[in-house]
């Protein structure tokens, strides 16, 4: 019995990413470093690492055989693309080995007309085999992977049918997580949803009781930019791990919350010893046209000038504001940072380069200018290799 216990413990620990690395990650889609190329060329370059999709409308116009073949082909491509994406991220420096997988791995998986396809024994067997390879790659390369079901997943809705559909959608993600070999331990994998819906924390608590063990192990809740803020999500701190979205908090409260804030300390505690993740985005540069990139935007001032919160919520292409970046990076000693931006990995790499520039300023005593310069060049070479 003791031997079995030790083996189970060892297998569980293997699922965990290394906890001592300060990571910056990006979401879902790989972008080639040279975005000046023609659209068709970029599509060809990015396709091997990018999900394919289809629509219910297209499937419903086809014969059953044609539609099922399309779903099968997409499954084959998407499972391979997810593995290639993880393998690519595994070539980056350790601090950049973090990525969110897209949610559309298996299109129409919870749709009433097509969910049957994804329960076929041959389909389940294929997914079990090939998504396991995705998880194996992540574990072998120490890539922290996660997922984020769409905003239509409203576990705290006051409409029972919406809650039922939301649970089904979350369990679809849990199936993928299970196939990848995760969900065995609290937060060996992060699957995040917003604290949305009229029922708020109480609704989330009720929904949790209906989730599978793997789903409960992986679920995280982030604070909303509208109704449900940090104080609301903290009501769930004993039930699940919390994600602090610092842009959401700024949009809702106009506050640049600090890592020393007691609320963030309680967020950290909700992870039960696992390194937390936070979400970071900034308002679009074209919305704040003319704003200095060395000054943090001030919400009360912007509102007084006629800016609308709705436009300020939208994510930027790049993390263009250096002052806001400096603030966000203050969280790095305490949590990994998931960058939510339109330019995906390219934006993430720029933020990491900004962090490196800040680190270079604080050079250890006894390190010469030439040694420091060599270190900087080596770091940059590492980033350049990762981009090719």
Residue ranges and their predicted role:
Residues 1-15:
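Short, Lys/Arg-enriched N-terminal segments with co-localized hydrophobic residues
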Residues 15-144, 153-167, 171, 175, ...:
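Alpha/beta catalytic barrel-like cores
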Residues 102-103, 145-150, 184-194:
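Core alpha/beta catalytic barrel or barrel-like domain that forms the active/cofactor pocket
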Residues 145-153, 243-250:
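Histidine-centered catalytic micro-motifs
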Residues 163-241, 247:
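Eukaryote-skewed repeat-based solenoidal scaffolds used as protein-protein interaction platforms
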Residues 222, 237, 241-244, 252-259, ...:
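Active-site-adjacent pocket scaffolds in enzyme catalytic domains
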């Amino acid at each position: 019995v003791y031997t079995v216990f030790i083996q189970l413990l060892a297998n569980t620990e293997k699922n965990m990413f290394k906890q001592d690395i300060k990571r910056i990650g990006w979401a879902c889609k790989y972008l080639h470093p040279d975005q000046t190329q023609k659209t068709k060329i970029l599509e060809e370059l990015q396709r091997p690492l990018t999900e394919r999709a289809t629509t219910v409308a297209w499937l419903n116009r086809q014969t059953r055989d044609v539609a099922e073949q399309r779903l099968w082909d997409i499954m084959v491509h998407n499972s391979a693309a997810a593995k290639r994406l993880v393998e690519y991220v595994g070539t980056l420096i350790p601090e950049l080995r973090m990525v969110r997988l897209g949610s559309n791995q298996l299109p129409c998986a919870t749709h009433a007309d097509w969910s049957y396809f994804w329960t076929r024994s041959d389909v389940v067997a294929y997914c079990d085999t090939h998504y396991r390879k995705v998880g194996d790659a992540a574990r072998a390369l120490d890539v922290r992977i996660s997922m984020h079901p769409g905003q239509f997943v409203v576990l705290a809705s006051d409409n029972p049918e919406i809650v039922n559909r939301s649970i089904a959608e979350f369990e679809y993600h849990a199936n993928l997580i299970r196939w990848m070999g995760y969900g065995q331990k609290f937060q060996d994998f992060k699957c995040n949803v917003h604290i949305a819906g009229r029922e708020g924390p109480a609704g989330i608590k009720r929904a949790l009781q209906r989730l599978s063990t793997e789903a409960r192990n992986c679920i995280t809740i982030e604070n909303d930019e509208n109704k449900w803020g940090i104080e609301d999500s903290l009501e769930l701190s004993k039930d699940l791990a919390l994600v602090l979205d610092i842009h959401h908090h700024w949009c809702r409260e106009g506050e640049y919350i600090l890592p020393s804030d007691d609320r963030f300390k309680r967020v950290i505690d909700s992870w039960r010893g696992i390194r937390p993740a936070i979400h970071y985005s900034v308002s679009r540069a074209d919305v704040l046209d003319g704003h200095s990139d060395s000054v943090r935007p001030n919400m009360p001032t912007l509102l007084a000038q006629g800016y609308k919160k709705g436009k300020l919520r939208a994510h930027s292409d790049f993390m263009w504001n250096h002052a806001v970046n400096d603030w966000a990076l203050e969280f790095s000693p305490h949590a990994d940072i998931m960058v939510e931006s339109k330019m995906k990995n390219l934006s993430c790499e720029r933020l990491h380069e900004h962090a490196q520039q800040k680190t270079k300023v604080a050079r250890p005593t006894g390190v010469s200018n030439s040694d420091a310069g060599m270190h900087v060049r080596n770091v940059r070479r590492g980033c350049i290799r990762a981009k090719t």
